[in-house]
């Protein structure tokens, strides 16, 4: 009896009556039956030789592709976009920032725009500015620690993107950072994709309403992709 009860827990992706639902580890439903399963990929996932199979075998609805990081293009970007375009798979993109100031943020935006044009991107999901607590390997540089600097950086990136005609631009970060140094209305209004590898998201953004994503794991295994994959529920 006990094993059966365990097996029937409503956790993760659950199929019922031809519909699909998502439950967190407290068995609380996230969103409705319209939730989407979204993965994000970069060169760290290696060469994904059969994108169609990845989508079909894993029930993936969308992909967020890494453009690269400040000043550098992701080695698999050209290939990933070519394949997603060819197969008509819905995607968005993200740029990991090493910005320390507004000049860096403007450079990040120009890099983003350049890559969007270079690969003729046809986006179904947003363009994400990936803001994390970065530091150089040798610790010679690290992310600004004060909220005010991040407000300036993010405002500058957003303004530069908007000026170039890009409207659907958002911020991705993780819960702990959003509760601390990124906890400012000017930043939170742009945040709709959040990482928290915990039983539940346990975070609410009063400054944004609309479709959003919870990246609930960085260590799922999907058929057709080597190594561990980030997976999000879109709701």
Question: What residues fall within each predicted segment?
Answer:
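Extracellular adhesion/carbohydrate-binding repeat motifs centered on closely spaced tryptophans
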Residues: 1-34
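Functionally critical loop-and-helix segments that line ligand-binding/catalytic clefts
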Residues: 31-43, 49, 57, 187-235
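Substrate-binding cleft of extracellular glycoside hydrolase catalytic domains
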Residues: 34-158, 162-164
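Conserved beta-strand positions
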Residues: 41, 65, 129-131, 171-174, ...
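Hydrophobic anchor at the start of a short beta-strand
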Residues: 91, 167-169, 192
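Glycine-rich, charge-decorated loop segments at or immediately adjacent to ligand/cofactor-binding or catalytic sites
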Residues: 104-107, 177-185
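Structural recognition of alpha->loop->beta junctions
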Residues: 113-128, 133, 182-209
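Aromatic-lined carbohydrate-recognition surfaces of secreted/lumenal glycan-active proteins
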Residues: 166-179
């Amino acid at each position: 009896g006990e094993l059966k009860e365990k097996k029937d827990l409503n956790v993760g992706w659950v199929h019922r009556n031809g519909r699909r639902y998502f439950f967190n580890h407290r068995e609380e439903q996230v969103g409705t039956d319209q939730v989407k399963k979204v993965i994000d990929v970069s060169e760290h996932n290696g060469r994904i030789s059969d994108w169609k199979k990845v989508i079909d075998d894993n029930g993936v609805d969308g992909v967020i592709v890494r453009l690269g990081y400040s000043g550098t293009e992701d080695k698999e970007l050209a290939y990933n976009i070519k394949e997603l375009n060819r197969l008509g798979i819905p995607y968005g993109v993200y740029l990991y920032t090493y910005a320390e100031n507004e000049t860096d943020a403007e450079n990040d935006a120009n890099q983003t725009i350049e890559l969007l044009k270079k690969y003729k991107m046809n986006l179904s999901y947003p363009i994400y500015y990936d803001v994390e607590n970065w530091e150089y390997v040798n610790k010679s540089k690290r992310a600004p620690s004060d909220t005010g600097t991040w407000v300036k950086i993010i405002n500058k990136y957003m303004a530069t993107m908007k000026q170039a005609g890009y409207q659907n631009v958002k911020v991705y970060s993780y819960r702990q950072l959003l509760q601390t140094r990124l906890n400012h209305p000017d930043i939170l209004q742009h945040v709709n994709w959040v990482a928290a590898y915990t039983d539940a998201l346990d975070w609410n953004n009063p400054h944004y309403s609309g479709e959003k994503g919870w990246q609930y794991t960085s260590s799922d295994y999907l058929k057709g992709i080597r190594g561990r994959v980030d997976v999000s529920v879109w709701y």
